[in-house]
């Protein structure tokens, strides 16, 4: 069964289509690709698995070219993105071109940013192949590359025209990558939907076994929540910032440890537990809630504490560069219970040090 979620943004609205065997049927994409040149951006890991299948799906289109990039967060850079621009320019491709992002979050972010930048904007389509990209990064129009001094510091808000989520892609996903994606799934339950959080607690084994119905429900619910939030606040001026639960701590871990050493979802897992502990210290949540949050991450073999090699000074150095910082003041997304979160700027360095030291 195929599920569709619509991201309603007026003239820039687009569908998210979720189901099995979607890479075998190009018909749903046809109207978005009519009379267009197509450049498929993928990486060295995904290309042998799915590039041929996508090219076959697009066999009715005359100009379909791939660009194959190295795989890994450490390659999410302006210099690597230049390979996309070079391919476009060498083929004299203009604004009648569609970029297709075939891969995980890194490929999606880079392709989207390239689409936003090339000739001041061309269309792009997301075909996410990892759980993390299916439930989070492919939806909502955040595109970016990293800088040595911070994650996702160079980018743009730029919405795709279409998101195609084939859940069969998860069958080739390494277990560590699947677990990292579950960190973002769990995040939605904590910050938006307590009932979904409880459902996740009850369905750990089904999800780990890649049960089709469980996966499609979880991915669909995450996309519904993400669409709802993006419709309310596309450019993260208010409620969309809640989607960054765990990310201020998490981005600090990624930057300090070196991009790719910790997967993004692993850093978000540890970061969300740190945020929950901070909430408990501030009296926002009971310790029992912190225990449930920690236990659910642990059930998917995700880290629930900071790296032993990181100290408070290293954390705070990176956290001060967070995009939510306002007038020099750190703003943290903290859980207020299950299904609720808020933004707090009253957390002192002393309180943060206590949280980090005890984690």
From Swiss-Prot:
Pathway: Metabolic intermediate biosynthesis; chorismate biosynthesis; chorismate from D-erythrose 4-phosphate and phosphoenolpyruvate: step 2/7. CDD domains: DHQS. Keywords: Amino-acid biosynthesis, Aromatic amino acid biosynthesis, Cobalt, Cytoplasm, Lyase, Metal-binding, NAD, Nucleotide-binding, Zinc. Zn(2+) binds at residues 184, 247, 264. GO terms for molecular function: 3-dehydroquinate synthase activity; metal ion binding; nucleotide binding. It is found in: Cytoplasm. NAD(+) binds at residues 71-76, 105-109, 129-130, 142, 151, 169-172. It is an enzyme of class 4 (lyase). Binds 1 divalent metal cation per subunit. Can use either Co(2+) or Zn(2+). It comes from the Bacteria. Its main location: cytoplasm. It catalyses: 7-phospho-2-dehydro-3-deoxy-D-arabino-heptonate = 3-dehydroquinate + phosphate. One of its GO terms (biological process) is amino acid biosynthetic process. Pfam families: DHQ_synthase, DHQS_C. Its EC number is 4.2.3.4. Coiled coil: none annotated. The keyword Cytoplasm applies. Its cofactor is Co(2+); Zn(2+); NAD(+). GO terms for cellular component: cytoplasm. Catalyzes the conversion of 3-deoxy-D-arabino-heptulosonate 7-phosphate (DAHP) to dehydroquinate (DHQ). Belongs to the sugar phosphate cyclases superfamily. Dehydroquinate synthase family. This is 3-dehydroquinate synthase. The gene is aroB.
């Amino acid at each position: 069964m195929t599920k569709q979620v619509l991201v309603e943004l007026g003239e820039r609205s687009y569908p998210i289509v979720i189901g099995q065997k979607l890479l075998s049927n190009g018909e749903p994409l046809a109207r978005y690709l009519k009379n267009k040149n197509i450049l498929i951006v993928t990486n060295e890991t995904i290309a042998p698995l799915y590039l041929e299948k996508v090219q076959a799906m697009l066999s009715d289109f005359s100009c379909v070219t791939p660009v194959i990039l190295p795989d890994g967060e450490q390659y999410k850079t302006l210099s690597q993105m230049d390979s996309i621009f070079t391919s476009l320019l060498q083929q004299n491709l203009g604004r009648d071109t569609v970029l297709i992002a075939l891969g995980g979050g890194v490929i999606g972010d880079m392709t989207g940013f390239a689409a936003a930048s090339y000739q001041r904007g061309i269309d792009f389509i997301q075909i996410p192949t990892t759980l993390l990209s299916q439930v989070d990064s492919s939806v909502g129009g955040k595109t970016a590359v990293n800088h040595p001094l911070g994650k996702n510091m160079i980018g743009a808000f730029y919405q795709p025209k279409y998101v195609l989520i084939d859940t069969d892609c998860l069958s080739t996903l390494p277990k560590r990558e699947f677990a990292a994606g579950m960190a973002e799934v769990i995040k939605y339950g904590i910050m938006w939907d307590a009932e979904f959080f409880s459902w996740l607690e009850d369905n750990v084994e089904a999800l780990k076994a890649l049960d089709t119905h469980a996966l499609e429900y979880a991915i669909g619910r995450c996309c519904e929540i993400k669409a709802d939030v993006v419709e309310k606040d596309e450019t993260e001026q208010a409620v969309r910032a809640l989607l960054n639960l765990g990310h201020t701590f998490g981005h600090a871990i990624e930057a300090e440890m070196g991009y790719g050493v910790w997967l993004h979802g692993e850093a978000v897992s540890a970061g969300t537990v740190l945020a929950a502990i901070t909430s408990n210290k501030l009296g926002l949540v009971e310790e029992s809630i912190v225990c449930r949050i920690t236990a659910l991450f642990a059930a998917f073999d995700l880290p629930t504490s900071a790296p032993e090699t990181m100290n408070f000074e290293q954390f705070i150095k990176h956290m001060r560069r967070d995009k939510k910082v306002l007038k020099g003041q750190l703003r943290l997304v903290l859980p207020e219970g299950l299904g609720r979160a808020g933004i707090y700027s009253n957390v002192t360095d002393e309180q943060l040090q206590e949280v980090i030291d005890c984690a």
